[in-house]
Curated annotation (Swiss-Prot):
SUPFAM superfamilies, alphabetized: Carbamate kinase-like (SSF53633)
Name under which the protein is recorded: Putative inactive aspartokinase 3 HI_1632
One protein family per Pfam: ACT_9
PANTHER family, per database record: ASPARTATE KINASE (PTHR21499), ASPARTOKINASE (PTHR21499:SF59)
GO BP terms: amino acid biosynthetic process
Similarity remark: Belongs to the aspartokinase family.
Any one GO molecular-function label of the UniProt entry: aspartate kinase activity
Length: 121
């Protein structure tokens, strides 16, 4: 019976492009990986702690909430655009302007063009 693999990456393992590429290779190498969990990139947790220590408790939610929004409808347009492809992972990065997807390399150019058309044309 095949097993279900859950891959979890965070910290320095998602700190930069090379590290993320290594994570992607791990996921692709195991066909039983069905769930990929990403936590904060290297240093993000420390930045959040510093933010929390430097701001009054009543201000924290407002300050953090200001950066954790996405323009109405953009997420739906992204999901609608990629629904016909085999997307193995979608992750928002440390910025709400950063969306990462793990897809088969032969479809990557087509997906990028489709997303560009959907979001910018």
């Amino acid at each position: 019976m095949p097993y279900l693999s859950v891959a979890k990456f965070g910290g320095t393992s998602v700190a930069n492009h090379d590290a993320m590429t290594a994570c992607a290779k791990i996921v692709i190498a195991d066909p039983n990986t069905r769930v990929v969990v990403l936590s904060a990139s290297a240093g993000v947790t420390n930045l959040l702690v510093a933010l929390a220590n430097g701001v009054k408790a009543t201000e924290r939610e407002k300050l953090i909430g200001n950066d954790l929004h996405i323009t109405s409808g953009v997420a739906k347009r992204i999901f609608d655009t990629v629904q016909s492809y085999n997307v193995r992972m979608i992750s928002y990065g440390a910025s709400t302007n950063n969306v990462c997807m793990l897809v088969q390399s032969e479809h990557s150019d087509e997906i990028v063009r489709s997303l560009h058309k959907s979001l910018f044309e």
